[in-house]
A protein has these predicted regions:
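A generic structural signal for short beta-strands and their flanking turns/coil linkers
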Residues: 28-30, 71, 140, 290-294, ...
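C-terminal hydrophobic structural anchor segments
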Residues: 321, 327-384
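Short Gly/Ser/Thr- and Asp/Glu-enriched loop/turn motifs at secondary-structure junctions
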Residues: 104-108, 147-150, 289-293, 338-342
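Gly/Gly-Pro- and Ser/Thr-rich, intrinsically disordered tail segments characteristic of DNA damage-repair
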Residues: 1-228, 238, 282, 365-422
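Short, charged/polar surface micro-motifs in flexible loops or helix N-caps
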Residues: 15, 38-41, 301-305, 350-354
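DNA-contacting surface of Y-family translesion DNA polymerases
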Residues: 9, 192-340
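Short, hydrophobic beta-strand segments
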Residues: 109-115, 307-310, 352, 357-363
Length: 422
């Protein structure tokens, strides 16, 4: 009989605000809101501290509205480099207990501690040690869920906040989980929750007791998946941290990013796609490839994801052509049922840059060579003076979204459970 898994989900509490308070102790206990640009009243709240939340301030709220809820609120500009550094520190702590660490954005991660129990004790004990270590070494708090799968572990970390540990086991599973709103379950976004409400399915327990055939008929394959999750059935593994295919031939080059805030507009999406395309193009040049296809992957705030590919008329290593192809795919296939949370751009169908290209009548070989030389020169400047020494003008329209060095950070985030159209 296989040993039951022990999965932890660690969620840093009010992460951006907590990092700011750890870095600026004078902010402790005060109502603060981290935002992209405090000088722009049209900006939004990225994260609020618990004192601000108790006054009604919420993530995504316009700054003027946040100030109406809390007159004494302190607006703090976002420092993405700081949050990235704190995120890497938390991962170093996780890796002391297991090599199966699957980050989800900067502030969350799943850990498979099944094999760690012989060294460190029960899952609950490991969770307590991790929580105490993060608090002692970093000065921030986290909530940890402990269960036998990823879905229930995440429900556990959401169950009590801040600075709490929740164990969901076979004995208390129905007591804890079944009364929770269906919207608390992984993959239940606003649109799906509204549909479930229409079928009088308001809780996870009601979802678990529904007929799977009915859910599949009404919601498609996601309905069957939600029924499994509601019944505690989730066999998805926790990936090993930075798992790589060693010495495998390069078949594609890509980057993805879970953004520091939800993406709300086409311009938000274009900024992120372009900075990812810059990274992909630079790495194509480093490895002496051109690509004949581009893939874009999108994940929304309900954690539903899909990928789409397109074939290019000419092989390229140019960032603008890669970005334009990816953005065209996004415009064609995404319909804004939910806000976007993560985007990936990948160059596929690679060929060595030494292979000759068949140039069409409307495609200038001289222009292509000129652009490739220009982008290679920009690579050289960035290698010498840093990534932020040269940036596109559009990046200055949103300092938070543009504060990602995708090439050097090279963060590839996990795909969701589902593949399909949103």
């Amino acid at each position: 009989m296989a040993k039951e898994r022990v999965i932890l989900h660690c969620d840093m509490n009010c992460f951006y605000a907590s990092c700011e308070m750890a870095y600026h102790p004078e902010l402790h206990g005060k109502p603060i809101a981290v935002c992209g640009d405090p000088e722009r009243r049209s900006g939004i709240v990225l994260t609020a501290s618990y004192p601000a939340k108790r006054m009604g301030v919420k993530t995504g709220m316009p700054l003027w509205e946040a100030q109406q809820h809390c007159r004494d609120i302190i607006f703090v500009p976002a420092h993405y480099d700081l949050y990235t550094r704190f995120s890497s520190y938390t991962r170093e702590i996780f890796l002391r207990y297991t090599d199966q660490v699957e980050p989800f954005g900067l502030d969350e991660a799943w850990l498979d501690c099944t094999a760690s129990q012989s060294l460190f004790g029960t899952g609950e004990r490991i969770a307590r040690e991790i929580s105490d270590t993060i608090k002692d070494e970093l000065g921030i708090t986290c909530s940890v869920g402990v269960s036998w799968n990823k879905t229930l572990a995440k429900l556990g970390s959401d169950y009590k906040k801040p600075d709490a540990i929740t164990v969901i086991n076979r004995q208390n599973f129905e007591k804890i989980v079944f009364p929770l709103p269906a919207s608390d379950l992984l993959y239940v976004g606003k649109k799906t929750a509204s549909k479930l409400d229409g079928y009088a399915i308001h809780t996870i327990g009601a979802l678990a007791k529904s007929r799977p055939e009915f859910l599949q008929q009404k919601l498609g394959k996601v309905g069957l998946l939600l029924w499994r999750f509601a019944n505690g059935l989730d066999n998805a593994p926790v990936a090993k941290y930075e798992q790589r295919e060693v010495l495998a031939p390069i078949k594609s080059i890509g980057n993805s990013w879970t953004t520091p805030r939800d993406l709300l507009t086409d311009q938000d999406v274009w900024i992120v796609i372009y900075l990812l395309a810059e990274s992909v193009a630079a790495r194509l040049r480093e490895n002496h490839f051109r690509c004949r296809g581009v893939e874009v992957s999108l994940r929304d705030s309900s954690l539903f994801s899909f990928e789409r590919q397109t074939h290019l008329s000419q092989p390229t290593m140019q960032e603008k052509e890669i970005a334009t192809a990816a953005f065209t795919l996004y415009k064609k296939h995404y319909h804004w049922n939910e806000h976007l949370r993560s985007i990936g751009v990948r160059a596929v169908d690679l060929q060595p840059d030494t292979e000759p290209c068949q140039i069409s009548f409307d495609y200038s070989a001289e222009k292509q060579e000129e652009m490739e030389h220009l982008e290679a020169a920009i690579d050289g400047v960035r290698n010498r003076f840093g990534y932020y020494s040269v940036q596109r003008a559009i990046m200055y329209t949103d300092k938070l979204l543009s504060r990602c060095d995708a090439k050097n950070d090279h963060t590839i985030h996990p795909h969701g459970y589902l593949q399909g159209s949103i």
